[in-house]
């Protein structure tokens, strides 16, 4: 399965954290491409530092639900805490979102594929089109069209 994941960090050494997360993904899957890092303003939440974002494309034998668990384990290994006191859209050492898994459509309590807000997030679409200019998002069409139609959240 080919999967697209977005990576984000705004605490600690974000560039090092994103590189480390990509390396960790490569240990369980094959990283096909990693975008440049993009500095973006946070969306909502409390006042916080800008994010560093990237997109990675992997080839994996994992099922989407297994890949989600791997992504969450990588987040935890980099200091991410998930609990009731976690601030939605708050600062974090690492955030990994599954954006696309082949052309699958998944809507379960644990996982929604494609990511339900990917089509409106410039910080996902811009790095993604850099490494896959012909990319499409199931249900939304070509990434290039989404970027042209704007306005997008940084």
Predicted regions and their residues:
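N-terminal beta1-alpha1 ligand-phosphate binding loop
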Residues: 1-28, 34-41
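Flexible, gly/pro- and Lys/Arg-enriched active-site loops
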Residues: 35, 43-50, 65-68, 72-154
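Glycine-/small-residue-rich active-site loops that bind phosphorylated ligands and cofactors
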Residues: 10-13, 63, 131
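Short, solvent-exposed beta-strand edge segments and adjacent coil->beta transition regions
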Residues: 2, 51-55
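A general structural signal for well-ordered alpha-helical packing
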Residues: 18, 22, 31, 53, ...
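Short beta-strand-to-loop capping motifs
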Residues: 9, 56-62, 100-103
């Amino acid at each position: 399965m080919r999967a697209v994941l977005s990576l984000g960090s705004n605490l600690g050494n974000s560039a090092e954290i994103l590189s480390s997360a990509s390396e960790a993904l490569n240990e369980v899957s094959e990283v096909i491409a990693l975008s440049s890092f993009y500095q973006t303003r946070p969306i909502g939440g409390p006042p916080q530092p800008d994010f560093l974002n990237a997109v990675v494309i992997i080839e994996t034998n994992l099922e989407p639900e297994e890949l989600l668990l791997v992504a969450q384990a990588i987040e935890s290994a980099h200091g991410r805490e998930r609990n009731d006191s976690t601030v939605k859209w708050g600062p974090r050492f690492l955030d990994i979102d599954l954006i696309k898994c082949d052309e699958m459509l998944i809507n379960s309590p644990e996982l929604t594929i494609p990511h339900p807000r990917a089509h409106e997030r410039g910080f996902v679409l811009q790095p993604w089109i850099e490494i896959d200019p012909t990319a499409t998002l199931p249900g939304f069409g070509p990434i290039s069209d989404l970027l042209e139609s704007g306005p997008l959240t940084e």
